Structure formats: C-alpha cells, structure tokens
A protein has these predicted regions:
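Conserved loop->alpha-helix
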Residues: 1-219
Length: 219
C-alpha cells in the first residue's frame, strides 16, 4: 500500500522485451538500503515488484495485462517517473490509500498557470467517472491529488510549485496520457450499496438516483 506522496523523481534507464513481457530498470535517488527482493515500489502509480536492485536503481518485470491497462507500454529510456516505496506502519499518512492498481488511463486536456500554482484538467474514461467526487481524492501518475471541480468525466486540479518540482507533473502537457486510480473507498461503498447484486454484474454498475432512493439513501 502507498500514500501517493512521491519520494523520488526517477527515470526509466532501460526497457527490455522478455518473452512478450517487459523488464524495466528505473534509476532513482531513493535510499535502497532497506529494499528486499519482492518489495513493492509504485512507479507512476503502478505497483511493481522488485526483482533486482542496486544503490541507485531497481528492476521489475511487467506483465502484458499491466502494459495494456497503463501508460507503461509507451515508456522509453529517459522517461520521468514518480517513485514511492510501500508505506511502513511508521510512515506519515500524508496522502490517501493508494493500492498501485491502475483503474484507467486519462488524458491531460488543459494546462495553465494559476497565480503560483498550476491548473490542470484531466479527461477520465466515462466508466470511472462515477467513482469521482469534488474534493475527493484521485491518484494521477502515483500522485495523491484533490479534485477541485468535476464536470462529467472532466476533473480539474490545482498543484502547488513544490508538488510540480518534485514529480513528473512539470512535464505534463495537453495530450499527455496519465495513469488514474480512483479512491478505493468509492469502490467499497459501491459494493456495500449493491450487496448481492454486485456478484451479478460483470462490467457496469446499476447504481442510480432511483436505486439510492429505493434503498433509503435519499429522501
């Protein structure tokens, strides 16, 4: 589990094809002295398992599933990545609960300066829009962010200079694809509201205003 508070801005050192999958090597200035084989490190929001490491790098294998569901398939040597080691019981919980399981790929649509901060708009796939809420949390390329406003599937974000400087956010431009992970609490709430009906659905939620009213959640 992670918090979405980025510890290092790393970069892709190499991308190798291994039997149809991919092996990544990531350069980082993280302290790697406490890393062990099999540890998890979030890389642009993707939970990767360490298979090898050194003082300033780590390597991980990536499955075809991850390549298809994340932006990882477009990474090349030199690509900047946000890096966070898995949290410890003693870690300050400064962000929100992040699993490292990417839900969808979004697209940056607007980038502009807003006083000293940066203003962004991100288009999220329609299927995850139901899990988003104004002032709620979302993980974008591994960064825990607060949704300022929401218009359908378009969410707006404001970032302070500190966050932009310590992450890959400074490289975001209109058209850039980003990894999105919704707040896991939204998924648990959906499951609780649906009850046994959740097991019957495969791809689409049937939560609606009438459903909430019928079950006593709206008056």
């Amino acid at each position: 589990m992670f918090t979405g508070i980025i510890e290092s801005l790393g970069k892709v050192a190499s991308v190798q094809n291994v039997g149809g999958d991919v092996r990544l090597r990531i350069e980082t200035d993280l302290d790697m002295s406490d890393v062990h084989l099999g540890d998890s490190i979030a890389t642009n929001g993707i939970c990767l398992t360490v298979i090898d490491w050194g003082d300033s790098w780590y390597a991980a294998d990536v499955s075809r599933e991850s390549l298809n569901r994340t932006t990882l398939g477009s990474w090349k040597a030199g690509h900047p990545v946000n890096v966070e080691k898995a949290m410890l019981p003693t870690t300050r919980f400064g962000g929100h609960i992040v699993s490292g399981h990417v839900d969808a790929i979004g697209e940056i649509t607007v980038v502009r300066e807003d006083a000293r901060s940066l203003y962004f708009e991100v288009a999220a796939p329609a299927e995850i829009a139901k899990y988003l809420a104004e002032k709620g949390s979302i993980t974008v390329d591994g960064v825990s962010l607060t949704i300022n406003h929401l218009r359908g599937n378009i969410l707006s974000l404001n970032l302070i200079p500190h966050t932009a400087e310590r992450t890959n956010i400074g490289t975001w431009k209109a058209g850039v694809k980003v990894n999105l992970e919704v707040d896991v609490l939204a998924r648990y709430i959906e499951r609780l509201l649906l009850g046994d009906k959740a097991a019957e659905q495969k791809t689409q939620s049937n939560i609606s205003m009438s459903f909430l009213a019928e079950n006593g959640f709206l008056k």
